[in-house]
Regions:
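Extended boundary segments
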Residues: 40-98, 166
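A residue-level signal for beta-strand positions that form part of recognition/binding surfaces
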Residues: 52-54, 112, 173, 342, ...
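Buried, small/hydrophobic-residue-enriched core segments of structured protein domains
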Residues: 2-49, 59-61, 97, 103-112, ...
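An N-terminal, globular interaction/scaffold subdomain
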Residues: 76-82, 117-120, 124
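Short, conserved beta-strand edge motifs with alternating hydrophobic and charged residues
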Residues: 247, 275, 303-305, 325-327
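A structural detector for beta-sheet-dominated domains
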Residues: 56-58, 118, 392, 414
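Gly/Ser/Thr/Ala-enriched C-terminal appendages of enzymes
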Residues: 2-49, 63, 294-295, 300, ...
């Protein structure tokens, strides 16, 4: 696809689909204290105590009213690859990170517990138990950093994408953030953007891994390469066809629009779209739409880029724009680059073998609520989400029964 106006719809579910690719070990994508805690627990005899960890946010970043779950599929893949290779064991031994007993445990490490969580694309609020990890303390504790690393970034991007998609009022939004982030983060951002409602990406690696439709045609450098703008546009149309999207603001926008339409018609077709990347986008969109219509190019679409966020997109709502390309603000969470999620122990096995609720008490808003949580969504008769109910219960049967009694749809699924 070479058009900036994608025609292929993509769902949050399809963003979790990937091809089989070799995955390197993820076990050292963690903080050192995860392993030193493991060592201490092995020495104190508490490492095998059954434990329940929850991943949640104490509050939402800024003044935002909801978050969007993303990263679940990536985390499950990362946990599958969470094994310690001989080279990694050697590194931990040489640097004295942990002792030999702990290294023996890590050599054979495979997560064998259970994980429940919200499906990708679900909205959430402060306190929502997005992920519940149950296993021994040893095997569940050391997943903390990895889980937070993936969820904090992916949820931040998905929330930003959702806000932008809402502001766009059904006009398609496309990820252009590859050059504005770490090369691997950009791939994750492309995936999360689709969970949040975007319909395509410029990132080819994301297209390969996740089946996301890819878009892209040319930059200003392609126009500058040629001796004239006419030659550049003719070359692009000859290569990509008249349905391509041409960037028309390298020199004069009005002249660029006229030349782009002419180049497409010389090839026997109508121009697919023009892209605006500078200036007052609202004013320019009105001018360009009027010019295209006057030229008879009524089917030619207008796509805009240039440091867009949800506020800029909302400001363009009345303008005759057909699609948006978003880069920097998307991959940085539109000013909130982390979802501010935490991973806390909420229940653990006591010395007598019974499960006990545990919680952190402290000032400064960093306390936690003990006990395993079960969450459900209550819908109106019209199917609109009205509220989220969270109940604390150590028993799955009791937790689900409480949700059912309130008429709430359970949000956590076995992953």
């Amino acid at each position: 696809m070479n058009d900036y106006v994608p025609t292929t719809a993509l769902t949050a579910e399809s963003a979790t689909t990937s091809i089989d690719v070799p995955t390197a070990s993820t076990s050292l994508l963690t903080d050192m204290y995860e392993l030193t805690m493991l060592q201490g627990a092995l020495e104190s005899g508490t490492a095998t105590r059954r434990s329940v960890f929850e991943l949640f946010g104490r509050r939402l970043p800024g003044s935002r009213r909801f978050g969007v779950v993303a990263g679940t599929g990536r985390l499950l893949d990362a946990i599958e690859a969470f094994t310690f290779t001989p080279d990694q064991i050697d590194f931990l031994h040489r640097t004295g990170v942990v002792n030999d007993e702990t290294l023996d445990f890590l050599r054979d490490y495979r997560f064998s517990g259970t994980i429940r969580g919200y499906a990708e694309g679900e909205c959430y609020f402060a306190g929502s138990p997005l992920l519940t990890v149950e296993g021994t303390f040893a095997e569940a504790c050391i997943l903390e950093t990895l889980a937070l690393s993936i969820y904090n970034y992916d949820c931040a991007v998905a929330a930003a994408a959702s806000r932008m998609t809402i502001a766009a009022h059904r006009r398609p939004c496309v990820d252009f953030g590859a050059r504005r982030a770490h090369e691997l983060a950009a791939v994750a951002a492309a995936r999360a953007s689709v969970v949040g409602g975007f319909v395509g990406t410029s990132n080819l690696e994301a297209g390969l891994l996740y089946g996301i439709p890819t878009v892209g045609t040319s930059a200003h450098s392609f126009t500058l390469l040629h001796d004239t703008e006419e030659e550049a546009f003719a070359a692009q149309v000859a290569s990509l066809g008249p349905g391509t999207t041409i960037l028309v603001d390298t020199y004069d926008i009005a002249t660029g629009v006229e030349r782009a339409v002419k180049a497409a018609r010389a090839a026997g077709g109508e121009l697919g779209a023009v892209r605006l990347d500078s200036g007052d986008l609202v004013a320019e969109a009105f001018k360009v739409r009027a010019q295209l219509d006057a030229l008879g190019a009524t089917s030619t679409k207008i796509t805009v880029t240039n440091d867009l966020d949800e506020h800029a997109i909302a400001a363009l709502g009345a303008a005759p724009v057909d699609s948006y390309g978003v880069g920097t603000k998307l991959v940085t969470g539109s000013g909130r680059p982390t979802a501010a999620l935490v991973y806390k122990l909420v229940e653990r096995e006591g010395a007598d073998g019974t499960m006990e609720e545990v919680a952190k008490f402290s000032s400064g808003g960093k306390s936690t609520v003990g006990g395993r949580k079960w969450a459900g969504r209550i819908l109106t008769a019209e199917g609109t989400a009205a509220e989220e109910l969270v109940v604390s219960s150590g028993s799955q049967d009791q937790g689900l029964a409480a949700l059912d009694e309130a008429g709430a749809r359970p949000l956590q699924v076995l992953l």
